[in-house]
A protein has these predicted regions:
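N-terminal, polar/charged subdomain of small-to-medium soluble alpha/beta proteins
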Residues: 1-125, 131
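Core catalytic alpha/beta fold that binds nucleotide/phospho-ligands
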Residues: 68, 73, 94, 104-106, ...
């Protein structure tokens, strides 16, 4: 990610049970994980304090345990879910590149490995809020709390609510409006679906 520092983890070996074939999920096989964790390391670099960074040993332990505890048919699903779990677990990580290699992929031909690499990050989104029915403030506050409850969203800031006159000539009550900023792992259409 442009403008951010990165912590690199290359070739973390994990024995896990992912695959389409029953033997793969029953017997298991070796997987190799490589990650680029995108964050600012400036405070950690100036202060020499681990608390200002991300402990890459803990990330490795977490990823190993996560891949061992879950089973997916596709390495695409294993990569997606593990990357999401890392981003949710460590708030300092703004994004990551996650590669999952399957060196023993059962394709029946000589190959070094099969892999999937994904890039995931937190996105900033702005959501407008408004109501002119019933307990307007309660509706808006309920919407904010519903967004706070979404695991893939972090509400960053909520504006004050202001009252505005309706527009368009239709006889109706005044609106109570506001806006909020949130960071989300969801893609735009996924966020719209959650808001719907």
């Amino acid at each position: 990610m442009k403008g951010l520092d990165e912590i690199r983890i290359d070739g973390l070996e994990v024995f896990a049970n992912h695959g389409v074939f029953p033997e793969e999920t029953r017997l298991g096989q070796k997987f190799l994980v490589s990650m680029r964790l995108y964050l600012s390391t400036r405070r950690a670099g100036l202060g020499d304090e681990l608390a200002a960074s991300v402990h890459y040993g803990e990330v490795c332990e977490f990823v190993t345990a996560y891949l061992k505890e879950h089973t997916w048919k596709l390495i695409e699903a294993a990569a997606e879910q593990t990357a999401r779990a890392v981003l949710l677990r460590w708030p300092l990580i703004e994004g990551l590149s996650f590669e999952l290699k399957k060196p023993w992929a059962p394709v029946g031909l000589p190959l070094e490995s099969v892999s999937v690499r994904i890039d995931r990050r937190w996105h900033r989104a702005y959501v407008a809020l408004g109501s002119n029915l019933g307990d307007r403030r309660a509706y808006l506050e309920g919407a904010v709390e519903a967004l706070r409850a979404l695991p893939d969203c972090r509400v960053v800031e909520v504006s004050d609510f202001i009252e505005t006159k309706p527009f368009g000539g239709v006889e109706q009550g005044d609106f109570l409006n506001g806006c909020l900023a949130l960071d989300t792992l969801l893609y735009p259409l996924e966020l719209l679906h959650e808001l719907g």
